[in-house]
Amino acid sequence: MSVRSLPAALRACARLQPNDPAFTFMNYEQNWDGAAETLTWSQLYRRTLNVARELSSCGSVGDRAVILAPQGLEYVVAFLGALQAGRIAVPLSVPQGGASDERATSVLRDASPVAILTTSPVIDDVTQHVSAQSAGPAPSIIELDRLDLDAAAGSGAGTENYPATAYLQYTSGSTREPAGVMLSHQNLVTNFEQLMSGYFADTDGIAPPDSTLVSWLPFYHDMGLVLGVCAPILGGYQAVLTSPVSFLQRPARWLQMLATSSHAFSAAPNFAFELAAKKVSDDDMAGLDLGNVLTILSGSERVQPATLKRFADRFARFNLQEKVLRPSYGLAEATVYVSTSRPGQPPELVEFDAESLSTGQAKQCESGAGTQLVSYVLPRSPIVRVVDPDTCTECPDGTVGEIWVCGDNVAIGYWNKPEESERTFGGKLASPSEGTPEGPWLRTGDSGFITDGKMFIIGRIKDLLIVYGRNHSPDDIEATIQEITRSRCAAISVPGDRSTEKLVAIIEYRRRGDSDQEAMDMLVAVKREVTSALSNSHGLSVADLVLVAPGSIPTTTSGKVRRAACVEQYRQQQFARLDV
């Protein structure tokens, strides 16, 4: 389907396949076994137009409409209605205290919305939170479930005069206050075409017509929004959705949805693969077959090869093919997608000498002797280069640098942050190679390298640990620890003696043992095993291993570890240690 915007794609779907199911939401709060709620394309389009009409009296084209609603079909309709009305949609999670409140407060202050789209079950929390923001005129609060969304839409609902920015995707804020990435309809349509070309490279970017997008990812994060809401509309595919809470309550629900949907295409962060491999039983999968699954992409956080292997091995008996697992790299500033692994084969894992990587050079080594990294296709679109961030020159093959991205999927910039936008989105190459544009380039802040025509990602540059003058990826260190503890952990560096940095690891640990002495013995054994593994695999001596209760490590709303907050809590001795 060739369209220029998401509203145009929705209109086309409603015209071409009005009575086909568009979105099905599995409500496990209403029924433990799941109650299916389905909208056809014509119903979805009618509800979208009615929300747009309601918004037409709130501000004007280009004003912001924030969605603060639980995961469900109302959220989908709210997002689409805002776009249809020419308002800039701002997807958010319902404020529930703590970090979520701080995030919502920051976004509401930054976006200055004219309207809040919500539902009656959460109206009290939303109203209380919005009322506490005193700056500027109060936004209109619209309860979607109190509107007659199925009324005849008539004409005049919405606009064709769309603003340059379609929606603001606020970053998770793991290292700073959330920033609103300004994404256009062109960004979205382009990135959809790019990701289809990547995942379906062997079929000219075309998925089977009966493909189903299956997702439990939150709509307020980039991967959940694009996969769960936008991609089904842009491709004309059915979506079967549920909530993150429903997945966390019972991970088997995700696998069951994959097995019962035709040609399922899904996505999840690394922790979900680990959780599913550990928690889903054979009884949960009785009578189910995963042989029809098209793709399960792993993204949003560092892909751990060992986790994917455990997942593939666990569900092989239910005919899951390892080749459908597709490690993927992307970021909100590039809409969502940049690259994935090669199609038609299992993820390719390559080992590199850890000592060489710490000095900025990639040298392959024998299996089991180094750092294992996933290989990604070096895409034609978008254009990707590895660049020396100091000289702005392209790095030679095998040299570690910063990943830069150029293409029509790259966002306009950050909302209300011109200086940060210029730093991030205004990269210019010095003496670019033939066929490589000078700029503007998106500076991703991620380190990586290219070798043999393949791309490898190391991690966030800001998160790199410098220990005794060498660079170490916290993701690699955490992966080593997690192979022992199978729990969340954070590798951080803190100032030591004589202006050096020392390595500290914070590890969430569930106490085991029948007596206090047995529990302490097991805890000491874990610390000994972790210390040995870090020495053998990374040549690192750990200055302090801090074992804490599950849930102690600060994270973002998407589950990423907030390492800067960990450093501060450690320095202030705020972690309640289990090992003292």
UniProtKB/Swiss-Prot annotation:
Disruption phenotype: Deletion of the gene leads to defects in phenolic glycolipids (PGL) and phthiocerol dimycocerosates (PDIM) production. It catalyses: holo-[mycocerosate synthase] + a long-chain fatty acid + ATP = a long-chain fatty acyl-[mycocerosate synthase] + AMP + diphosphate; a long-chain fatty acid + ATP + H(+) = a long-chain fatty acyl-AMP + diphosphate; holo-[mycocerosate synthase] + a long-chain fatty acyl-AMP = a long-chain fatty acyl-[mycocerosate synthase] + AMP + H(+). GO terms for cellular component: plasma membrane. Keywords: ATP-binding, Fatty acid metabolism, Ligase, Lipid metabolism, Nucleotide-binding. One of its GO terms (biological process) is fatty acid biosynthetic process. Pathway: Lipid metabolism; fatty acid biosynthesis. Disulfide bonds: none annotated. Residues 423-444 are annotated as: Disordered. Its EC number is 6.2.1.49. Pfam families: AMP-binding, AMP-dom_DIP2-like. GO terms for molecular function: adenylyltransferase activity; ATP binding; ligase activity. The keyword Ligase applies. Belongs to the ATP-dependent AMP-binding enzyme family. PANTHER family: DISCO-INTERACTING PROTEIN 2 (PTHR22754:SF32), DISCO-INTERACTING PROTEIN 2 DIP2 -RELATED (PTHR22754). Involved in the biosynthesis of phthiocerol dimycocerosate (PDIM), a cell wall-associated lipid found only in pathogenic mycobacteria. Catalyzes the activation of long-chain fatty acids as acyl-adenylates (acyl-AMP), which are then transferred to the multifunctional polyketide synthase Mas for further chain extension. This is Long-chain-fatty-acid--AMP ligase FadD28. It comes from Mycobacterium marinum (strain ATCC BAA-535 / M). The gene is fadD28.
